[in-house]
Amino acid sequence: MKKMGPIILAVVIAIGTFALKMMGVIGFKTPPLVEGPKIMFYVPLPEAMHDFPFAMEMASGVYGFPVTITVISTWFVMLFLIMVFRWSSKNLEVVPERKQAFFETIYGFLDDLYGQLLGNWKKKYFTYIGTLFLFLLISNIVSFFPIPGFSSENGVFSIAPALRTPTADLNTTVGLALLTTYSFIAASFRTSGFFGFFKGLFEPMPLMFPINLAGEFAKPTNISIRLFGNMFAGMVILGLLYKAAPVLIPAPLHLYFDLFSGVVQSFVFIMLTMVYIQGSIGDAEYLED
């Protein structure tokens, strides 16, 4: 009976929602893409509450700089990761308990994955690539965090998702791609030198310089547009599905577009990052700092 509890609760909520909809107490509102493809409810407010100041603003500014929902979501992801890192590093023991064993398993998996491509160079890039992977993973699935946002417009009280997938914003993916670009160019400078890097652009013959140069510019473009396109496309598709059937049909698809696709795209981004870094390193031996 306990296992049936969540199912019964979900059925009761669905039936109650439809009943309120039929009575005109609440209504469904198709969310704009900038707020995520989730169900939003709107409730008509009494005139006395039309000017009530709701605290949750989707976009504002600080000292002239815009603070959008993407920025807020990115801050949330960074704060969440800092809290997880601090919690996971407390009370470490020689014989690990379940919490410590869980994080050591993740560390071991990433260490083996990086070692296959980077060899001994993984010692230098593990921190960056590991942090990048965890940031991408949480950013891609942040829409699963049940944090509501509230707003009031024209006498209508709206409940919408407070967070948006940061990687569905091109500004985020381009910024991450530029960090990766700096990493593999710095690796090339480290192993081949400044002039060696530019000499490589003329190989195997000088006529290849335009193509090689275009290839270097294509790397950050590739990883940024790939990640942005996949995450934003998922939002568009789910938004269309919510437009057609706002309650039951789109819900299971979040497991694919938000969870499965988010995990896969995180792996794709870091794998391409490691491939680019490995291509810059080549056969050079690991150099200690």
Curated annotation (Swiss-Prot):
GO terms for molecular function: proton-transporting ATP synthase activity, rotational mechanism. GO terms for cellular component: plasma membrane; proton-transporting ATP synthase complex. The keyword Thylakoid does not apply. One of its GO terms (biological process) is sodium ion transport. InterPro entries: ATP_syn_F0_a_bact/chloroplast, ATP_synth_F0_asu, ATP_synth_F0_asu_AS, F0_ATP_A_sf. Pfam families: ATP-synt_A. Its main location: membrane. PROSITE patterns: ATPASE_A. It comes from the Bacteria. It is a multi-pass membrane protein. It is found in: Cell membrane. Keywords: ATP synthesis, Cell membrane, CF(0), Hydrogen ion transport, Ion transport, Membrane, Sodium, Sodium transport, Transmembrane, Transmembrane helix, Transport. Key component of the proton channel; it plays a direct role in the translocation of protons across the membrane. NCBIfam families: ATP_synt_6_or_A. F-type ATPases have 2 components, CF(1) - the catalytic core - and CF(0) - the membrane proton channel. CF(1) has five subunits: alpha(3), beta(3), gamma(1), delta(1), epsilon(1). CF(0) has three main subunits: a(1), b(2) and c(9-12). The alpha and beta chains form an alternating ring which encloses part of the gamma chain. CF(1) is attached to CF(0) by a central stalk formed by the gamma and epsilon chains, while a peripheral stalk is formed by the delta and b chains. Belongs to the ATPase A chain family. The ATPase of P.modestum is of special interest because it uses sodium ions instead of protons as the physiological coupling ion. This is ATP synthase subunit a, sodium ion specific. It comes from Propionigenium modestum. The gene is atpB.
